[in-house]
Swiss-Prot record:
GO terms for molecular function: [glutamate-ammonia-ligase] adenylyltransferase activity; [glutamine synthetase]-adenylyl-L-tyrosine phosphorylase activity; ATP binding; magnesium ion binding. It is an enzyme of class 2 (transferase). Gene3D superfamilies: 1.20.120.1510, Beta Polymerase, domain 2, Glutamine synthase adenylyltransferase GlnE, Nucleotidyltransferases domain 2. It catalyses: [glutamine synthetase]-O(4)-(5'-adenylyl)-L-tyrosine + phosphate = [glutamine synthetase]-L-tyrosine + ADP; [glutamine synthetase]-L-tyrosine + ATP = [glutamine synthetase]-O(4)-(5'-adenylyl)-L-tyrosine + diphosphate. Involved in the regulation of glutamine synthetase GlnA, a key enzyme in the process to assimilate ammonia. When cellular nitrogen levels are high, the C-terminal adenylyl transferase (AT) inactivates GlnA by covalent transfer of an adenylyl group from ATP to specific tyrosine residue of GlnA, thus reducing its activity. Conversely, when nitrogen levels are low, the N-terminal adenylyl removase (AR) activates GlnA by removing the adenylyl group by phosphorolysis, increasing its activity. InterPro entries: GlnE, GlnE_rpt_dom, NT_sf, PII_UdlTrfase/GS_AdlTrfase. The lineage of its organism: Bacteria, Pseudomonadati, Pseudomonadota, Gammaproteobacteria, Alteromonadales. Belongs to the GlnE family. Its EC number is 2.7.7.89, 2.7.7.42. Its cofactor is Mg(2+). Residues 1-450 are annotated as: Adenylyl removase. It comes from Shewanella sediminis (strain HAW-EB3). This is Bifunctional glutamine synthetase adenylyltransferase/adenylyl-removing enzyme. One of its GO terms (biological process) is regulation of glutamine family amino acid metabolic process.
Length: 954
């Protein structure tokens, strides 16, 4: 390919170059006298194609003479470490260290980008240099911080007194020495042995030492200052993701991967590499990780894992509307990586030569071993090189992490100019050809799912027929007795004919509909089934990718029809949020609900696909995860795969996982501006979320809101010296927790493309809507003991700790038990509970005499809940075990065991409660109000009324 030095610049680029040239001459008037015309011409050209280089040189014109004195052609990557060591050695403050690292990074990046634009070096050499620079900067920062912290806390040592280092594992392209120009860096921090520091004022546990060091290292590299940043650092690939410790020991790392390591983590670990000078610890670390990554047998399960991972990426591309993405799209950079890594995982256990981080080296080894043909290797390498060069140049234009082709004319001109292409169309042709080759080899490796388009279906004729008689004859020939089918189909077809869906969309719809009709016509009432399906189609007519999804995936079509027939609620969800159609592709996965213990880890893994700093996409990711998991629960519910008794457990544990991530995101956002309260121990937040009502009772339904109360641990009396946060904009600690609570509510309530996360009701907090949004925990306890009404103690029966520090969990449990165990006069209590129940019924019960409101009618859910709450408040003073549970089922079981309620009554209340809740779930999925004909519930309701009267009306 040509380079830019041999071509005249398009006018759109010279306009940019002129502006920068003027700025540079103003900053450095003697420019033209110090460099010759040839170099001036080259400088002018580079300023036209790269905003990053132009901005840096306008700020640092003194770099220019050295660039033309041999620095452009020759970059000695082996000298990076030495140069940085010399620069960092005299450094005495963190601010100074940040400035040194950023200045060095920017100066070297200018050199490396300049070489790329002019084609002075091969792409392979450029990637090696970018990776070496990144590694040198990380290690320089690490080593400087290690010296600083050792002076402050002493040297971390094992139990024999041997010094322990912080090991940094480079993941992804950094590990493979193939880093992009403006990539973020995925790191994992670890250390060899537990122990404590020696030589400091007081001994500090090694893990605490390295966590402090890790936090400061991330900040040293990641923080944006006046000089920019060194690298965007992503630590989410560490064990347990964001909820795990920032740094763990070798043994903890090994235990995690042996016991909990997932398939995607195996793929990630293929490129894992200990950064910095190679030591015995590096050997130990790689030897320890190898059995997890490379199995001793030939491991074909890797292919299935790859399919699932690719499916997730494809879904993400659709959901985020990532068009023109040369990394994640079909045939993109990621597919080359998947092809090579799948072979490495399958055969790496038997073939040590495949255990390498570099894609270039691994693909050559695959050819040597006969695993890939020469033509496949050549196609993959040349196509990969083209896409990586495009990616590198795109990022070097503005030092932005992007893999998306330009959306503006200027950057297209720049890219075409640097690639030696005459036009956008010519470059697109080359890119599309490369991606087509990659995708073909990817499908050869993992298996494709193309559909036979030649199948001739009678439904094809039905979809295209114009005459009513012909259509009715076709339907009659199939013995379908549904007079509404053709009128409904024709009406819908005529309606969508008026809509503008584009030629590609129209063509895909015409291919899809015969197959979809083949799913519908065998049903008892095809027209009835078509109605909800058509509403889903209405929403995706202009989103061709979803039409293509249904066309290309028979399983997705089958599930669409099946679920729309089974539940109007599900069909409404699919119509409102078409991205859920992705979940229908794999029926086995759709009906395999996440285990109750795994919602947290699944959500953390899901959010790994979203840039940590992209708050909008993080919010969208939370909502999409909730929607997809709710769909799986509902699908398993309506088909009987999931027992109805388990539905609320799943919906509640899903909410808990989301609450955890919302609080953590809110914490990051608030603390990034204001720092954190200084009274906290390392890793603590001093904050808790308490669930009330259905959330507290583990009884959430589809569409339930969350009744929450927020607590914190700070008080001026206990921490008089820690009144403010420690950030650049410190604020009073109470104000910090108020901002945190407000941010949490914002994250829950903001309506994105995927809707609202949850509606949150905070009215059960102390003093209700007029009270503080977040309460100090001891004030909360005092309020409950001295000011709370009986109905607030009833609510406390169903309160449960849902997220927060262990110390707060323990304290809340104690306070709750103390309040529930207060002595109460039973007659007075019974009267207050009855009066509250009567007020509720008068205010909320709106149903005709022949209907039964599952919640509010006499003998309904509310009566059962009030029985449980009264009996706990009346008897917990003498039976402390009654204050343990927050859910009604276990409360009634305990009451029966204690003989405070006859065993038969306890069992009948449990059965009635489960029946009413199950019916409520069923009616929600049918999008019907929570009411049944009175005769259907009369037996259950009558027994509840009798028990209610026996317990409360004495």
């Amino acid at each position: 390919m040509e380079n830019i030095s041999n071509k005249s610049l398009p006018a759109i680029i010279t306009d940019v170059a002129d502006r920068y040239w003027q700025r540079l001459n103003e900053a450095w008037p003697e420019l033209s006298t110090l460099i010759d015309k040839k170099h001036c011409d080259e400088l002018y050209r580079i300023m036209g194609v790269s905003d990053f280089i132009a901005e840096q040189l306008c700020r640092h014109p003194d770099w220019i003479p050295a660039l033309f004195d041999g620095q452009l052609v020759k970059v000695e990557r082996l000298s990076f470490d030495r140069e940085l060591h010399e620069l960092m050695e005299p450094c005495r403050s963190e601010d100074e260290a940040k400035a040194i690292l950023r200045c060095y990074r920017n100066r070297l990046m200018v050199r490396l980008a300049w070489r790329d634009f002019f084609g002075y070096v091969s792409l392979e050499d450029s990637l090696l240099d970018l990776s070496a620079l990144s590694e040198a900067l990380i290690i320089a920062g690490r080593d400087w911080l290690y010296r600083e912290l050792c002076q402050q806390y002493g040297t971390p040592c094992d139990r024999e007194g041997n010094p322990q280092p912080l090991m940094v594992i480079g993941m992804g392209k950094l590990g493979g020495r193939e880093l992009n120009f403006s990539s973020d860096i995925d790191l994992i921090f670890t250390f060899p042995e537990h122990g404590e520091t020696q030589g400091g004022r007081r001994a500090l546990d090694n893990q605490q030492f390295f966590i402090k060091m890790g936090q400061r290292l991330v900040n040293l590299l990641h923080q944006v200052t006046v000089d920019g940043f060194v690298y965007r650092v992503d630590m989410r690939l560490r064990p347990y993701g964001e909820s795990g410790p920032l740094v763990v020991s070798f043994s903890a790392l090994e235990d995690y991967y042996q016991e909990q390591g997932r398939d995607w983590e195996r793929y990630a670990m293929v490129k894992a590499r200990a950064l910095g000078p190679w030591t015995a610890f590096s050997d130990e670390l790689h030897s320890m990780l190898r059995p997890f990554v490379y199995r001793r047998y030939i491991d074909f399960s890797a292919i299935e894992s790859l399919r699932k991972m690719k499916q997730l990426i494809t879904q993400e591309v659709r959901r985020r509307k990532l068009t023109d993405n040369i990394k994640l799209g079909a045939g993109g950079i990621r597919e080359v990586e998947f092809v090579v890594q799948s072979f490495q995982l399958i055969r790496g256990g038997r073939e040590p030569s495949l255990r390498q981080q570099s894609l270039f080296a691994a693909i050559d080894t695959l050819y040597t071993l006969g695993q890939l043909e020469y033509l496949a290797v050549d196609d993959l390498k040349q196509s990969y090189l083209l896409l990586r060069r495009v990616e590198n140049l795109l990022q070097a234009i503005g030092d932005r992490q992007t893999q998306t082709l330009p959306d503006n004319g200027l950057d297209w001109y720049r890219l075409c100019h640097c690639m030696g292409m005459a036009s956008e169309a010519e470059l697109r042709t080359h890119i599309e050809s490369a991606m087509s080759k990659i995708h073909r080899h990817f499908n050869d490796t993992v298996g494709g799912n193309e559909q036979d388009e030649s199948s001739q279906l009678w439904t094809q004729q039905l979809w295209s027929v114009q005459e009513d008689e012909h259509a009715q004859a076709l339907i009659s020939e199939q013995s379908i007795e549904d007079p509404d089918l053709w009128p409904m189909l024709k009406s819908w077809r005529d309606t969508i004919a008026k809509r503008s869906i584009g030629p590609r969309g129209r063509d895909t719809l015409d291919k899809l509909m015969p197959w979809l009709l083949r799913e519908l016509t065998p049903l008892v009432s095809p027209s009835k089934a078509f109605e909800p399906v058509s509403k889903v189609l209405d929403q995706i007519l202009t989103r061709t990718t979803y039409l293509e999804l249904l066309y290309e995936n028979p399983g997705a079509r089958q599930q669409l029809v099946s679920l729309c027939c089974a539940s109007p609620w599900i069909s409404a969800q699919l119509a409102k949020f078409p991205m859920l159609l992705d979940e229908l592709i794999d029926p086995a996965q759709l009906y395999d609900t996440t285990s109750l213990d795994d919602y947290g880890s699944e959500l953390r893994q899901y959010l790994l696909r979203v840039p940590e700093e992209d708050m909008e996409q993080q919010m969208e990711g939370l909502r999409q995860f909730k929607l997809s998991q709710q769909l799986k629960i509902a699908a398993a519910d309506v088909t009987g795969v999931l027992p109805v008794s388990q539905v609320s457990n799943h919906l509640t544990l899903l909410a808990e996982a989301i609450i955890e991530q919302v609080v953590m995101q809110a914490w990051l956002q608030v603390s990034s501006r204001h720092g954190v309260p200084t009274h906290l121990d390392e890793g603590d937040m001093g904050f808790a979320v308490i669930g009330y009502g259905k959330a507290g009772g583990i009884e959430l339904g589809y569409g339930s809101d969350l009744d929450l109360v927020f607590l914190h641990s700070y008080s001026r009396e206990r921490f008089p010296e820690n009144t403010e946060t420690n950030g650049e904009r410190p604020i009073e600690v109470g104000h910090f927790y108020l901002k945190l609570a407000q941010r949490i509510l914002h994250l829950f309530s903001t309506r994105t493309n995927s809707g609202e996360l949850y509606e949150v009701d905070m009215r059960l907090r102390p003093s209700g809507a007029s009270g503080l949004l977040v309460s100090e925990i001891e004030h909360f306890g005092q309020y409950q003991r001295e000011e709370a009404w009986t109905w607030e103690h009833q609510a406390l029966v169903r309160a449960r700790f849902m997220f927060g520090d262990n110390a707060l969990s323990s304290r809340f449990s104690t306070l709750r038990s103390e309040v529930l165990q207060l002595h109460r006069e039973k007659e007075t209590l019974a009267q207050e509970v009855r009066e509250m129940r009567l007020k509720m019924r008068e205010h909320l019960l709106k149903v005709s005499p022949d209907m039964f409101d599952l919640k509010q009618s006499a003998g309904g859910i509310a009566d059962i809940e009030f029985i449980a709450q009264y009996l706990v408040l009346a008897n917990a003073n003498e039976h402390s075990e009654l204050s343990i549970w927050s859910d009604n089922i276990r409360i009634f079981s305990t009451l029966g065991e204690l003989a405070l309620l006859p065993q038969l009554d306890a069992q009948e209340l449990i059965q009635a409660y489960l029946f009413l809740r199950d019916e409520n779930h069923r009616l929600t999925l049918q999008q019907k109000p929570g009411q049944l004909a009175l005769e259907l519930v009369e037996l259950h309701a009558q027994r509840v009324i009798e028990i209610y009267q026996n317990v409360l009306e004495f």
